[in-house]
Curated annotation (Swiss-Prot):
Main location: nucleus
Biological source species: Candida albicans (strain SC5314 / ATCC MYA-2876) (Yeast)
Protein name as catalogued: Mating-type-like protein A2
Additional comment: The C.albicans mating-type-like (MTL) locus contains, in addition to the genes for the regulatory proteins (MTLA1, MTLA2, MTLALPHA1 and MTLALPHA2), a and alpha idiomorphs of a phosphatidylinositol kinase (PIKA and PIKALPHA), a poly(A) polymerase (PAPA and PAPALPHA) and an oxysterol binding protein-like protein (OBPA and OBPALPHA).
Function according to Swiss-Prot or TrEMBL: Mating type proteins are sequence specific DNA-binding proteins that act as master switches in yeast differentiation by controlling gene expression in a cell type-specific fashion. Transcriptional activator that induces the transcription of a-specific mating genes.
């Protein structure tokens, strides 16, 4: 009875090693060295958006992995690159789904490895909480530096307070005009504090 390859059962926990994804009935794993395409990130004046950009390197698909593995076997007969690619393409079109599923499984493993590696190389900086903010960073105005200020904003001290200006405005009395004009005592107060007077003859 021919052996058919099946994907392992999916579980909720994420597998971090190849050994945990294989069992005694799995195909033998062939380790392939992948040249890292990422450059080391040094401390500089770049923005956070540029530092957290993922690498442009993509993991290989199932056919590329099959071609890289089978080309090592075909090149032992001193075949050139064109013959190797043509032979692998003919083989890929004539094999069953179990053969393709195996290399699809390898491509999933490689994509998981690449995602984990890229996330470790480019950690996203966590947002600063209010407990990490200094008192000096919160003040936009000048204050007395000789006075000891708290290092954090926790507690009920050194907090800014805003007071509403509730001072009374002096009400201007309407002027009394002579020479036959009478000014009404009623005034209209607009929001800008400008008084308008109704003059009746």
């Amino acid at each position: 009875m021919p052996y058919t390859f099946n994907f392992p059962k999916s579980q909720s926990s994420f597998k971090y090693s190849i050994k945990s994804l294989t069992n005694s009935r799995s195909f033998p794993m062939i380790s392939i060295y992948v040249t890292p395409q990422s450059t080391p990130k040094f401390i500089n004046n770049q923005s956070i958006d540029k530092m957290t950009v993922l690498s442009s390197f993509r993991s290989r698909n199932s056919f590329i992995i099959a071609r890289s593995i089978l080309s090592k076997l075909l090149r032992k007969n001193k075949a050139d690159f064109k013959k190797v690619s043509k032979s692998v393409s003919l083989l890929w079109g004539s094999v069953d789904n179990s053969f393709k599923n195996y290399f699809e499984y390898l491509s999933i493993l490689e994509s998981q490895w690449h995602d984990k590696k890229s996330s470790n190389l480019n950690p996203i900086s966590s947002t600063r909480t209010t407990s990490e903010l200094n008192y000096i960073e919160l003040c936009s105005s000048i204050y007395n530096q000789s006075r000891k200020h708290p290092r954090s904003v926790q507690g009920n001290k050194a907090k800014f307070r805003l007071y509403k200006n509730v001072s009374k405005k002096s009400n201007r009395k309407p002027r009394r005009l002579k020479n036959g004009f009478k000014v009404s005592r009623s005034t209209i107060n607009c929001s800008y504090g400008i008084y308008t007077e109704d003059v009746f003859q």
